[in-house]
Amino acid sequence: YGIRPLCFGTQKQDDGTLDYLVSSESVTMPALEFDLVRDIAPGEAVFISCDREMFCEQCAENPQLTPCAFEYVYFARPDSVIDGISVYGARLRLGEYLADEVAKQLDLSEIDCVMPIPDSARPAAQQLAQKLGITYREGFIKNRYVGRTFIMPGQQTRKKSVRQKLNAMPVEFEGK
């Protein structure tokens, strides 16, 4: 019902027929040589017949777009576009907004550096550091073989997974 993104694209075949691709992220389209057609609207159903005919129908009364904020902050790849908004651009704007708030509430001379938790926080942290004129540093290395820690069941499982997923680089923390 308009919480999670969904889009579709087409690819014209040599015989003139169209293949369709439905995906939660637009980034899959160019990677598979499909042309992004559009986002699927909240409450909309997309039907593709065996004859490769596609039609769409609104199935919900009063559908509303109520996107999950975590799509832009955490879930989506930075090179995706959701509802016409670049995920990377949204993360940069979050960094700008955070910089404005930090400048209002904190003494900037007390901040040693800006350091993201990889990977999704990186664009916002870079923008924050740039806007405030503060050094940007990488202090954590991510173990790519551990799944998404935010969505794991239970706090104990999340804590254990975070310990396995992130390794601090001691050189960035010594004397701090």
Per-range role (PLM):
Residues 1-176:
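PRPP-associated nucleotide enzymes
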